[in-house]
From Swiss-Prot:
It holds the Pfam family Ribosomal_S2. It comes from Brucella ovis (strain ATCC 25840 / 63/290 / NCTC 10512). The gene is rpsB. This is Small ribosomal subunit protein uS2. It comes from the Bacteria. Belongs to the universal ribosomal protein uS2 family.
Length: 254
C-alpha cells in the first residue's frame, strides 16, 4: 500500500477548504476550524479515511475489479488521465455524458464507432477524399475526448474515484443507481452523505489533486501486483493438485 505523511498533505494544501460562507453544514464533523474566513479541514480525520480509500482501491483491483477515475474540471483533467493510464485503469476527464453508466448499451455503440474510426484512420483511409478524411478525423477526435478513457473498460466499473463531487453530481447519481461504490475527495462545500469512501480535503488545488491521484494510482498498482501474486499461487496449487491423489492411491490400496 502506498505511504503518505501528514506533512505531504499539509504541503499540498489538502487542509484548505472553501470560504466559510460557501460551506455545506454536513461537513461540520470534518472541519477543524477557520482562518481568514477559510475553513480548515481536520487532517487527523483525512489520514485514516484516505488510508481506507486506498485499501478499497487496492482490494477492488486485487480481485480483478476496474476503477474509473472521474475529474472533468480544468485543473484535474490531465492529472486524472495520467493517473488512470499509469495504473492500467479508466477515466473520464472531459465531460460526463448523461447515462454514461446507466445507459451503457448506448455508450458501447459509441465506443464501437470510435474503434471503427480508429481502424479506418490507422490505414491510409483509401477511398476517402481529403474532406471525408477530415470529417472522420473530427468525429474521432470528438468521440475520443469523451470516451477514449473508457474505450477498453468493457462494462461498468467496480469502483469510481471522483474529484469534485459537486461538479460530478450526475456521475455520483448514476453510480448510486447501479450500486457502484464511490471514493471521492470531499471539500468543505460538499455533501459527504453521497459518498461511500469520503476523503476530506481540498478539491481545487492542483498539488492536492496530484497527490490524491498519485496515491490512488499506486493503490491500484498494488492491487495488480497482489492479483498477479495470487494468480501465481493458484497456478502452482493447480499444478500440484492432481499429483496428490496419485501418490496417495497406492497407500490406500496397501
Amino acid at each position: 500500500m502506498p505511504d503518505f505523511s501528514m506533512r505531504q498533505l499539509l504541503e499540498a494544501g489538502v487542509h484548505f477548504g472553501h470560504q466559510t460562507h460557501r460551506w455545506n453544514p454536513k461537513m461540520a464533523p470534518f472541519i477543524y476550524g477557520e482562518r481568514n474566513n477559510i475553513h480548515i479541514l481536520d487532517l487527523s480525520q483525512t489520514v485514516p479515511l484516505l488510508n481506507s480509500a486506498l485499501k478499497v482501491v487496492s482490494d477492488t483491483v486485487a480481485r480483478g475489479g476496474r476503477v474509473l477515475f472521474v475529474g472533468t474540471k480544468r485543473q484535474a483533467s490531465d492529472i486524472i488521465a495520467d493517473a488512470a493510464n499509469r495504473s492500467a485503469q479508466y477515466y473520464v476527464n472531459a465531460r460526463w455524458l448523461g447515462g454514461m453508466m446507466t445507459n451503457w448499451k448506448t455508450i458501447s455503440n459509441s465506443i464501437q464507432r470510435l474503434r471503427k474510426l480508429d481502424e479506418l484512420l490507422a490505414g491510409e483511409a483509401q477511398g476517402f477524399t481529403k474532406k471525408e478524411r477530415l470529417n472522420l478525423e473530427r468525429e474521432r477526435e470528438k468521440l475520443d475526448r469523451t470516451l477514449g478513457g473508457i474505450k477498453d473498460m468493457g462494462s461498468v466499473p467496480d469502483l469510481m474515484f471522483i474529484i469534485d463531487t459537486n461538479k460530478e453530481a450526475i456521475a455520483i447519481q448514476e453510480a448510486k443507481r447501479l450500486g457502484i461504490p464511490v471514493v471521492a475527495v470531499i471539500d468543505s462545500n460538499c455533501d459527504p452523505d453521497q459518498i461511500d469512501y469520503p476523503i476530506p480535503g481540498n478539491d481545487d488545488a492542483a498539488r492536492a489533486i496530484a497527490l490524491y491521484c498519485d496515491l490512488i494510482a499506486r493503490a491500484a498498482l498494488d492491487g495488480i501486483a497482489r492479483q498477479q501474486g495470487a494468480m501465481g499461487i493458484d497456478v502452482g496449487a493447480q499444478v500440484e493438485a492432481p499429483v496428490e491423489p496419485a501418490l496417495q492411491a497406492p497407500a490406500e490400496g496397501a
